[in-house]
Amino acid sequence: MLDDRARMEATKKEKVEQILAEFQLQEEDLKKVMSRMQKEMDRGLKLETHQEASVKMLPTYVRSTPEGSEVGDFLSLDLGGTNFRVMLVKVGEGEAGQWSVKTKHQMYSIPEDAMTGTAEMLFDYISECISDFLDKHQMKHKKLPLGFTFSFPVRHEDIDKGILLNWTKGFKASGAEGNNIVGLLRDAIKRRGDFEMDVVAMVNDTVATMISCYYEDRQCEVGMIVGTGCNACYMEEMQNVELVEGDEGRMCVNTEWGAFGNSGELDEFLLEYDRMVDESSVNPGQQLYEKIIGGKYMGELVRLVLLKLVEENLLFHGEASEQLRTRGAFETRFVSQVESDSGDRRQILNILSTLGLRPSVADCDIVRRACESVSTRAAHMCSAGLAGVINRMRESRSEDVMRITVGVDGSVYKLHPSFKERFHASVRRLTPNCEITFIESEEGSGRGAALVSAVACKKACMLGQ
């Protein structure tokens, strides 16, 4: 009898592993993804192929990295997900001539109707938050330079002018796509009329992260975010940036690699769960690479895998609760919590019981394996992108061994218990002639935007504007 039960358990385990095996990517797969990513990056940089390239490689007009001599008070805004942050950044000389960057900030959550209403509603809400923040800090009377971290695909015409190409990450505010975002912000501030601001720079969160980390480590020339979405930027040789005139020096390029796969480059790796997540998203067929990696989708992928295991009678006695059948019910933070479980399964039990389930010990272990499969694939898929960027940089600089630092931010990278380790190990396997240091950015987006503003202000002063 016991033998039968043990045999049944073993068979069940085998079937579960068979289903989860689809998530495993071999090194050859990752090399394939990496070389396709590099090809698309190349197409994005070239004038004649830029238009149809899935990876847009957008020039940011951030050319110089800050030198540590810009001082003053800056306001910084950060819009990139469901939370919006306003930050006051004091940039100055610390003790012993050291550089100091001090910050105060406040988070505001963005109501659904502002995310999906009109651009005017969204930017009016943003200027209301700024007004509230300035009141709290008695700063209404000051006209501060403002740096705006805006984490969506933007075609820059200058450091303070950029056209929104398309919304991502669940935003849908009408009347913003195709328009200058800085202009929309300036208009909203003017409409409000109770404070003045000088918007000097708009940057992507990857750029802000890179600049922020550059202060810690002067070899930081790549910025990456793995949070709600996933994206990276890096310093590219100007001669390769065909969309901007001039061949001297380097410019930071925002890859917008989340859109990789839009032209079918990932089709052979997409599973039924990926297709279901994509079909029920606000932007079907777009941002496919990001949908494999980003925190906005990870929990939902796990939920769909769990439902598949229930259907196959391998989990929860073949019965799913109403909650488990509800889209979005398995949150991405649950994935981190399940994988952080110490082994007594208490954390896993708690999460599953809030979803109306009464799991056995074996069920808990299967749920953990499902989470590990989805998050490990995300880490490996992400590593192929970064390895593509770093190998490209090494080749274009003709260095035998390249030392480089990558500044990273984002909730998945920072909060998931094993993402980092799996990701680092995989990147290093794919970049044999590179010595890579990873550093986490602290308050990266806000601080980085303020530092970019500081550079912009300094340049404006030098140009006598």
Curated annotation (Swiss-Prot):
| Phenotype when the gene is knocked out | Embryonic lethality caused by the absence of hexokinase activity. Conditional deletion in pancreatic beta-cells causes severe diabetes shortly after birth leading to lethality within a week. Deficient islets show defective insulin secretion in response to glucose. Conditional deletion in liver leads to mild hyperglycemia; however, mice display pronounced defects in both glycogen synthesis and glucose turnover rates during a hyperglycemic clamp.
What EC number(s) has UniProt assigned to this enzyme? 2.7.1.1
How does its record describe regulation of its activity? Answer: Subject to allosteric regulation. Low glucose and high fructose-6-phosphate triggers association with the inhibitor GCKR followed by sequestration in the nucleus.
Give start and end of each Hexokinase domain. Answer: 10-454
Which chemical reaction does it catalyze? a D-hexose + ATP = a D-hexose 6-phosphate + ADP + H(+); D-fructose + ATP = D-fructose 6-phosphate + ADP + H(+); D-glucose + ATP = D-glucose 6-phosphate + ADP + H(+); D-mannose + ATP = D-mannose 6-phosphate + ADP + H(+)
- Expression induction or repression: Up-regulated by endocannabinoid anandamide/AEA.
Positions annotated to bind substrate: S151, F152, T168, K169, N204, D205, N231, E256, E290
Q: Name the chain's protein.
A: Hexokinase-4
Coarse class of the protein's main subcellular location? cytoplasm
Q: Which keywords accompany this UniProt record?
A: Allosteric enzyme, ATP-binding, Cytoplasm, Glycolysis, Kinase, Mitochondrion, Nucleotide-binding, Nucleus, Transferase
Q: Which GO terms describe its molecular function?
A: ATP binding; D-glucose binding; fructokinase activity; glucokinase activity; hexokinase activity; mannokinase activity
Which residues take part in binding ATP? 78-83, 228, 295-296, 332-336, 411-415
Q: Which Pfam family, giving just one, matches this sequence?
A: Hexokinase_2
GO annotation (BP), single: calcium ion import
Region: Hexokinase small subdomain, residue numbers: 67-203
The source organism is: Mus musculus
Instruction: State its role.
Output: Catalyzes the phosphorylation of hexose, such as D-glucose, D-fructose and D-mannose, to hexose 6-phosphate (D-glucose 6-phosphate, D-fructose 6-phosphate and D-mannose 6-phosphate, respectively). Compared to other hexokinases, has a weak affinity for D-glucose, and is effective only when glucose is abundant. Mainly expressed in pancreatic beta cells and the liver and constitutes a rate-limiting step in glucose metabolism in these tissues.
Subcellular compartments? Cytoplasm; Nucleus; Mitochondrion
Give positions of region: Hexokinase large subdomain. Answer: 204-443
InterPro entries named in the record: ATPase_NBD, Hexokinase, Hexokinase_BS, Hexokinase_C, Hexokinase_N
- Return the similarity comment: Belongs to the hexokinase family.
Q: Please give the pathway this protein is involved in.
A: Carbohydrate metabolism; hexose metabolism; Carbohydrate degradation; glycolysis; D-glyceraldehyde 3-phosphate and glycerone phosphate from D-glucose: step 1/4
Cross-referenced PANTHER family, in alphabetical order? HEXOKINASE, HEXOKINASE-4
SUBUNIT field: Monomer. Interacts with MIDN; the interaction occurs preferentially at low glucose levels and results in inhibition of hexokinase activity. Interacts with GCKR; leading to sequestration in the nucleus.
Domain of life where this protein originates: Eukaryota
The entry's cellular-component GO terms read: cytosol; mitochondrion; nucleus
